[in-house]
């Protein structure tokens, strides 16, 4: 009876998730960053690899075109991996009329990383200027890994979320797009289980709350070593009134104590969704975007697909 109940609950959870919205054209992506250009509404999608892949489309559904790389020569940061940049996060600042892209230079599986930033007037290939490191790195062996940057403005003040594995996700105030404020980073989320698999923070505001989304679980190599069911990537959410700390999930559990309400997990042919973000679509409203493996196409990183779903809201919590 107990096993039957668990199976029923698992099937109910799987059936609760909507399939990704349509995508046409070049639909490959990995750790996507997504932004809709202010001037004409054109979408630009950024992805891990090389000098950060750029694709663009007239709408979120496509047709997507592969445009090239944001930084074709890699980063000016003198660090291993500066020709293979990770986890782009893009935002626009009205006061400078520029787009800013944070990226990570890192060594896979090690706490050996640097976060850098580039800027552009248009987001087009050929328009990006690399500014190098923002001063956030692991040279002093901190409790965090400096990858997966995510910019957020909280009550008018800019901040950066970042972190992967180790002691989890941290937040630090920014002085400007290129410099940290002189305040130490503080932890906002942590996963005590499965080798502390938590990363890819993305924070956004809705109503009176700030919502912190993150990916939890094993984030790749599924074609080589498939993890146990439920240990692959999935997307979770906590919320906070202040946006800087005290994030809790729907049950009230702290995000610093392995909390996190599941927003999206494997279902049907959708496997291991993660690397997520939220975009404000001019027509659709708030949209969750992410990468996932389509079981009908393959489980390798080169097979990953771009996924998106409109957010629904019930009692102050998002769902898809």
From Swiss-Prot:
Location (main, coarse): secreted
Subcellular location field: Secreted
Q: Which family does it belong to?
A: Belongs to the glycosyl hydrolase 43 family.
Catalytic activity, EC: 3.2.1.99
- Residue numbers marked as site, Important for catalytic activity, responsible for pKa modulation of the active site Glu and correct orientation of both the proton donor and substrate: 148
Per UniProt, the enzyme's principal EC class comes to hydrolase
List the molecular function annotations (GO) for this entry: arabinan endo-1,5-alpha-L-arabinosidase activity
Catalytically driven reaction(s): Endohydrolysis of (1->5)-alpha-arabinofuranosidic linkages in (1->5)-arabinans
GO BP terms: namely: arabinan catabolic process; xylan catabolic process
Q: Which UniProt keywords apply?
A: Carbohydrate metabolism, Glycoprotein, Glycosidase, Hydrolase, Polysaccharide degradation, Secreted, Signal, Xylan degradation
The root-end lineage is: Eukaryota, Fungi, Dikarya, Ascomycota, Pezizomycotina
Checking InterPro entries in the record gives: GH43_arabinanases, Glyco_hydro_43, Glyco_hydro_43_endo_a_Ara-ase, Glyco_hydro_beta-prop_sf
For whether the record's keyword set contains Glycoprotein, the answer is: yes
- PANTHER family this protein is in? ARABINAN ENDO-1,5-ALPHA-L-ARABINOSIDASE, ARABINAN ENDO-1,5-ALPHA-L-ARABINOSIDASE C
**Name used for this protein in its record:** Probable arabinan endo-1,5-alpha-L-arabinosidase C
Q: Which GO terms describe its cellular component?
A: extracellular region
Residues with attached carbohydrate: 73, 137, 191
Q: What does this protein do?
A: Endo-1,5-alpha-L-arabinanase involved in degradation of pectin. Its preferred substrate is linear 1,5-alpha-L-arabinan.
Q: Which Gene3D superfamilies match?
A: Glycosyl hydrolase domain, family 43
* Signal sequence extent: 1-16
Q: Which pathway is it part of?
A: Glycan metabolism; L-arabinan degradation
Q: Does the keyword Nucleotide-binding apply?
A: no
Native species of this protein?
Aspergillus terreus (strain NIH 2624 / FGSC A1156)
What domain of life is recorded for the organism?
Answer: Eukaryota
Active-site residues are 31 (proton acceptor), 199 (proton donor)
Q: Which Pfam families does the annotation name?
A: Glyco_hydro_43
């Amino acid at each position: 009876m107990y096993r039957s109940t668990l199976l029923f609950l698992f099937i109910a959870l799987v059936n609760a998730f909507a399939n990704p919205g349509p995508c046409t054209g070049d639909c490959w992506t990995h750790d996507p960053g997504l932004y809709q250009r202010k001037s004409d509404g054109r979408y630009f999608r950024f992805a891990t690899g090389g000098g950060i892949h750029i694709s663009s489309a007239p709408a979120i559904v496509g047709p997507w075109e592969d445009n090239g790389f944001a930084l074709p020569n890699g980063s000016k940061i003198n660090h291993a991996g500066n020709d293979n940049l990770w986890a782009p996060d893009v935002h626009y600042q009205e006061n400078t009329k520029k787009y800013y892209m944070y990226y990570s230079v890192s060594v896979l599986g090690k706490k050996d990383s640097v976060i850098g930033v580039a800027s552009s007037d248009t987001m087009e290939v050929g328009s990006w200027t690399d500014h190098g490191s923002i001063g956030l790195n692991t040279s002093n062996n901190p409790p965090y890994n400096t990858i997966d940057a995510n910019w957020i403005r909280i009550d008018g003040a800019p901040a950066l979320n970042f972190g992967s594995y180790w002691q989890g996700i941290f937040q630090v105030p920014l002085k400007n797009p290129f410099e940290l404020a002189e305040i130490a980073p503080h932890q906002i989320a942590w996963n005590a289980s499965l080798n502390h698999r938590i990363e890819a923070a993305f924070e956004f505001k809705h109503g009176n709350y700030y919502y912190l989304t993150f990916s939890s679980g094993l984030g790749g190599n599924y074609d080589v070593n498939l993890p146990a069911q439920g240990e692959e990537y999935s997307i979770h959410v906590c919320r906070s009134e202040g946006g800087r700390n005290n994030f809790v999930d729907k049950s009230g559990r702290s995000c610093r104590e392995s909390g996190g309400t599941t927003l999206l997990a494997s279902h049907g042919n959708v496997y291991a969704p993660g690397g997520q973000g939220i975009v404000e679509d001019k027509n659709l409203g708030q949209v969750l975007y992410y990468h996932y493996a389509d079981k009908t196409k393959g489980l390798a990183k080169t097979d990953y697909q771009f996924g998106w779903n409109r957010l629904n809201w019930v009692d102050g919590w998002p769902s898809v």
